[in-house]
Regions:
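Glycoside hydrolase catalytic-domain groove-lining segments
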Residues: 17-48, 75-76
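Carbohydrate-interacting/catalytic domains
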Residues: 20-24, 48, 53-57, 63-88, ...
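Active-site donor-binding segments of glycosyltransferases and PAPS-dependent sulfotransferases
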Residues: 5-13
């Protein structure tokens, strides 16, 4: 397996940008898909990127303190959906503030702080979905496992795509908004009529049994080059993963 350092560089360069200028660098997030099946890749955010004054992962993010966490949630969601195995370095799940130092322990107390604890729970939700849905790993090296819905919405810095496994019975739809601008009636194209069950979003995290996850019904109406579509209230830095 091969660490995908080129992807990591492009991903971090994009994530560090002021959201209002990300539209000029949209290709940094889409280029990696063009060669994602050529090797057995690991998408890694390594220790090399959180030392030597490069800043911790949370402090690479732009904006005010709360914005940093929202940005990182969006980034991690995109990373989860991107083909390739995943590797986060220690402390990146709860927003370690200091750079990595091999001589000291992580600042574990931060996990008890609201924003840090919320980020950790969100990452836990992402990993729960990763374990539960083979669509997120079984076809990393097969073009049938990934489909862009809209890779070209640079002006709004929104990405949407589908992950599939061999059965094509438990597909996942991802939507990621990388700006602080909410899209209250965001319409996304989909390939079929039916129910799209919301599994996770950036405001609630993972919807588990008893949470009453929302179900969106697609209807006939072309969008994003697809024959069906539905509308979803996409928040600032909004992320959403649907099962269909």
């Amino acid at each position: 397996m091969l660490f995908r350092s080129g992807w990591m560089h492009d991903f971090l360069e994009y994530m560090k940008l002021d959201p209002y200028f990300r539209k000029h660098n949209h290709n940094k997030m889409t280029f990696g898909i063009t060669y994602s099946t050529s090797e057995n890749f690991i998408l890694v955010l390594s220790h090399d990127e959180v030392v030597h004054l490069k800043c911790s992962m949370i402090n690479k993010m732009p904006g005010e303190y709360e914005d940093k966490f929202a940005n990182l949630k969006a980034g991690y969601t995109f990373m989860l959906g991107h083909p390739g195995k995943k590797l986060l370095f220690m402390g990146q799940d709860f927003g370690q503030l200091h750079e990595w130092d091999e001589k000291t322990a992580l600042d574990w107390y931060l996990a008890d702080e609201p924003l840090h604890g919320d980020l950790q729970n969100y990452v836990r939700g992402l990993l729960t979905l990763y374990k539960k849905y083979p669509a997120l790993y079984r076809q990393d090296n097969d073009w049938d496992g990934f489909q862009w819905i809209n890779a070209n919405d640079a002006d709004r810095s929104i990405f949407s795509f589908i992950r599939r496994d061999e059965t094509k019975k438990k597909n996942l739809l991802f939507i990621c908004n990388f700006t602080p601008i909410p899209r209250d009636d965001y319409r996304v194209g989909v390939p079929k009529r039916g129910n799209f069950t919301l599994l996770l979003d950036n405001e609630h995290g993972l919807y588990e049994k008893g949470d009453g996850p929302a179900v969106y019904k697609s209807s006939k109406g072309e969008c994003d080059g697809q024959p069906y579509s539905f509308s979803y209230p996409l928040p600032a830095y909004g992320t959403a993963i649907f099962r269909f």
